[in-house]
């Protein structure tokens, strides 16, 4: 591990030098990439330096214990030795976690898609509540949210919504939300007081930049059409809606929320890049990776990941057997404790694999 850490320190020092290089400073894309990696390695270097300092202190105490000491001094140095050994072990454990393989997409913005599943109007109403839950989470973290497209119904629910959350590391937090979310409650339209079960599917994709994935112009079919609101409201006389098809995969994206065709085209391409990258990533996963993701639960869409039981005021995450109460707080975006537990579970699984 020490050799690996020394390599990290060398890389960090090289990046520090690059950040002052005029050729890097004058290239915004390269500067952003260098700064991002520099920021990521900083905590590892800081922790390793603390580890090295503790090692030196431990050596000093061992040297003192080899010399002549009265009983009281020896007892004090022995206690300090125990404390330093404990500190060294803690730092070593923390460094092992920091050195775990990272998801290369963790630092990216995130594109999320919420779709009402089984349950009719009740599913669409819960889809709207989940959308609010994520926007409230974003507000708490001061993350920027942008709606890319939304389809509502007459019941006040959402059939489907595509939105983007812009924040460094947003994907690292929200990637655990992908899957089937199940709600159990008595719908407002239910006169007999019976509990109904409905489902909503959440897809989570990292935003891909042009440098991450190439979409060739000849692979795209772009159609423009007029966009109109529900019930004929805000009817757009110009052809501003954009329907974009990626021919090799058959993936289709439709954007009509903006008045400008150019804005809808830009949004559609952004979503298409994320979906195409996700499609190829799913195809490329090995059987071992599929098994790991099923165990850890970081995005299998068919997986029933969580149940929101309103009568019992509880939320259960089935992947790790976690149950929390105060469903009102959860629906108001207080889900960091659930995300933290999922992240810790993934860390433990990765550590076990590294040490196997």
Curated annotation (Swiss-Prot):
One Pfam family it belongs to: PCRF
PTM info: Methylated by PrmC. Methylation increases the termination efficiency of RF1.
Keyword Protein biosynthesis: yes
Cellular localization per UniProt: Cytoplasm
Keywords, in A-Z order: Cytoplasm, Methylation, Protein biosynthesis
Residues recorded as bearing N5-methylglutamine in the entry: 233
GO cellular component annotations of the record: cytoplasm
GO molecular function, one term: translation release factor activity, codon specific
Keyword hit for Cytoplasm: yes
Family: Belongs to the prokaryotic/mitochondrial release factor family.
Role played: Peptide chain release factor 1 directs the termination of translation in response to the peptide chain termination codons UAG and UAA.
Name of this chain's protein: Peptide chain release factor 1
Organism encoding this protein: Symbiobacterium thermophilum (strain DSM 24528 / JCM 14929 / IAM 14863 / T)
Gene of this entry: prfA
């Amino acid at each position: 591990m020490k050799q690996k850490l020394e390599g990290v320190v060398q890389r960090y020092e090289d990046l520090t030098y690059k950040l002052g290089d005029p050729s890097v400073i004058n290239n915004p894309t390269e500067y952003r990439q260098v700064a991002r990696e520099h920021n990521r390695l900083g905590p590892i270097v800081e922790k390793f330096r603390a580890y090295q300092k503790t090692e030196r202190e431990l050596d000093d105490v061992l040297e003192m214990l080899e010399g002549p000491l009265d009983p009281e001094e020896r007892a004090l140095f022995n206690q300090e030795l125990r404390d330093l050994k404990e500190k060294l072990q803690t730092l070593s454990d923390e460094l092992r976690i920091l050195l775990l393989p990272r998801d290369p997409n963790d630092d990216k913005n995130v594109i999320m898609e919420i779709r009402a599943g089984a349950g009719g109007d009740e599913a669409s109403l819960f889809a709207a509540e989940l959308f609010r839950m994520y926007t409230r989470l974003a507000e708490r973290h001061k993350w920027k949210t942008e709606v890319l497209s939304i389809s509502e119904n007459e019941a006040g629910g959402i059939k489907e919504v595509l939105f983007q959350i812009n924040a460094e590391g947003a994907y690292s937090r929200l990637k655990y939300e992908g899957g089937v979310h199940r709600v159990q409650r008595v719908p407002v339209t239910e006169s007999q007081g019976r509990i109904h079960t409905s489902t909503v599917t959440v897809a989570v994709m990292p935003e891909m930049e042009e440098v991450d994935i190439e979409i060739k112009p000849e692979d795209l079919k772009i159609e423009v059409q007029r966009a109109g609101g529900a019930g004929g409201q805000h009817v757009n006389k110009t052809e501003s809606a954009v329907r974009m098809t990626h021919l090799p995969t058959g993936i289709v994206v439709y954007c009509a929320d903006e008045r400008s065709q150019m804005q809808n085209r830009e949004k559609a391409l952004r979503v298409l890049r994320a979906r195409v990258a996700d499609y190829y990533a799913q195809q490329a996963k090995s059987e071992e990776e599929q098994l790991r993701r099923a165990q850890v639960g970081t995005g299998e869409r068919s997986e029933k990941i969580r149940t929101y039981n309103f009568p019992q005021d509880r939320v259960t995450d089935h992947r790790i057997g976690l149950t929390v109460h105060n469903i009102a707080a959860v629906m108001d975006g207080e889900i960091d404790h659930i995300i933290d537990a999922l992240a810790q579970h993934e860390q433990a699984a990765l550590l076990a694999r590294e040490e196997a």
